[in-house]
Amino acid sequence: MARRKKGAPLNGVMVVDKPQDWTSNAVLQKVKYALNAQKAGHTGALDPLATGVLPLCFGEATKFSQLLLDSDKEYVTCAYLGRTTTTSDADGDIIAESPVPGLSVSDLESVLGKFRGNLKQIPSMYSALKHKGTPLYKLARQGIEVEREARDIIIHELELLDYTPPFLRLRVLCSKGTYIRNLVEDIGQVLGCGAHVMELRRTRCGPFSLADSVEFVSFADESGRQAAAEKYKERLLPIDSSVQQFSEIILDEANTGSIIQGQTVKISPLSSEGKVRLYTNRRHFIGLGEVMSDGTVKPVRLLNVSALSAE
């Protein structure tokens, strides 16, 4: 007999505004406990120093978490020019200090232009990437540095928001895998004075922005847990909120049954190939499909319909 899962079945997405000095996993576990949820996962860690958009997926929504991990992210950061640290942010020890040259807006824009578009970025030793199974930050804390391969990233937008020496405020829209700490440090190096991140706030992750977020609530007792749970439940978004970038297809009853059984179906007319959201004729989301070149639709990632009906 299968072991009964602890907690209540809960399906959906919640966007939490992560507070400073909390790890992403600690926030996830606190919210999961508040809701007594069976299954939950976050969609890309933020550094403890960072705040902002942290989407949490519950139950069947975890099937689509990789799409959020792979999505573009937007950040607003405050860089401190003239000082570099061991971790490239304010949590690290100071390595070096240099005078900040007189910089005009034109000077700054000229340098920022070098960091827009397709770039190669070497991940920081103070990151969660693993080397032979060990997170790099654990090696760094032991004074061990290993070679890291440069990774392809895209800086879609890099906007100068304000410059009040030594503070430089930037808005960054970037691809997955971009380390803002590294970006800021590299900008400081080109400016000739060094830099590190003082503040970092994620303002968007895929389709979700701060407007979708709920304030994180910590608690120390059962009454506090219940109050937090009520607040969180009010802001639980439907499973398909994380896949709104794809067009939708409404299936008739016969095609719904075929798709659920893993079969490919013929639907016409279809405008283009690629992933699509699949719904029953009663507007119930059942998962993602893919439109093939021959006009057929095959299931890609489907919900467990029985799990949804058990809620």
UniProtKB/Swiss-Prot annotation:
Q: Does the keyword Cell wall biogenesis/degradation apply?
A: no
Q: Which family does it belong to?
A: Belongs to the pseudouridine synthase TruB family. Type 1 subfamily.
Q: Which gene encodes it?
A: truB
A Pfam family cross-referenced in the UniProt record is: TruB_N
Any one GO MF term held by the record is:
tRNA pseudouridine(55) synthase activity
State its role.
Responsible for synthesis of pseudouridine from uracil-55 in the psi GC loop of transfer RNAs.
Report the protein name in the record.
tRNA pseudouridine synthase B
Its source organism is Hahella chejuensis (strain KCTC 2396)
Per UniProt, the enzyme's principal EC class comes to isomerase
Identify the SUPFAM superfamilies for this entry. Pseudouridine synthase (SSF55120), PUA domain-like (SSF88697)
Report the PANTHER family cross-referenced here: PSEUDOURIDYLATE SYNTHASE TRUB1, TRNA-PSEUDOURIDINE SYNTHASE
What is an annotated GO biological process for this record, any one?
tRNA pseudouridine synthesis
Q: Which catalytic residues are annotated?
A: D47 (nucleophile)
Q: Is the Isomerase keyword given for this protein?
A: yes
Instruction: Report the EC code(s) recorded for this entry.
Output: 5.4.99.25
Question: What UniProt keywords are attached to this protein's entry?
Answer: Isomerase, tRNA processing
Q: Which reaction(s) does its UniProt entry say it catalyses? A: uridine(55) in tRNA = pseudouridine(55) in tRNA
Question: Which residue stretches, if any, does this entry annotate as coiled coil?
Answer: none
Show the CDD domains listed in the entry: PseudoU_synth_EcTruB (cd02573), PUA_TruB_bacterial (cd21152)
Report the superkingdom from the record: Bacteria
